[in-house]
């Protein structure tokens, strides 16, 4: 995570494949949010997220902390305005998951939807 010369630190690396690239930060701490929002790329994760934003590639940040301070909210807004998708880990109980595994699968499906990955996981289909 400290090798700022690794492939993901370069926009060329992201554009090298035949498939569109995306970056998922799961889970994403408020420390990481703050570093990326401020442009302080202290490690490869921060730098790769910075590159994803500058290259206009999908960046999905699944945040895990609550409650949120005003500083957290400003940082999240800054990242959203820069193009990131902010997804607090808030599972949907309206699908009535039978257990934690179903709950996690459904949330993973929502993450996959954000980056255009095809999947067969449960989706909300409206009221029955």
Question: Where would I find each of the regions flagged by the language model?
Answer:
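A cross-family phosphate/adenosyl-ligand binding-site feature
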Residues: 1-60, 64-128
């Amino acid at each position: 995570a400290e090798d700022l010369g690794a492939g993901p630190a370069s926009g060329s690396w992201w554009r090298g494949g035949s498939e569109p690239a995306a970056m998922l930060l799961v889970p994403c701490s408020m420390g990481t949010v703050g570093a990326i929002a401020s442009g302080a790329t202290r490690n490869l994760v921060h730098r790769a997220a910075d590159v994803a934003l500058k290259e206009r590639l999908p960046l999905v940040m699944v945040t895990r902390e609550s409650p949120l301070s005003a500083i957290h909210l400003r940082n999240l807004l800054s990242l959203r305005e820069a193009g990131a998708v902010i997804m607090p880990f808030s599972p949907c109980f309206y699908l009535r998951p039978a257990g934690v595994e179903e709950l996690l699968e459904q949330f993973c499906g929502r993450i996959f939807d954000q980056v255009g990955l095809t999947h067969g996981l449960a989706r909300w289909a409206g009221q029955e």
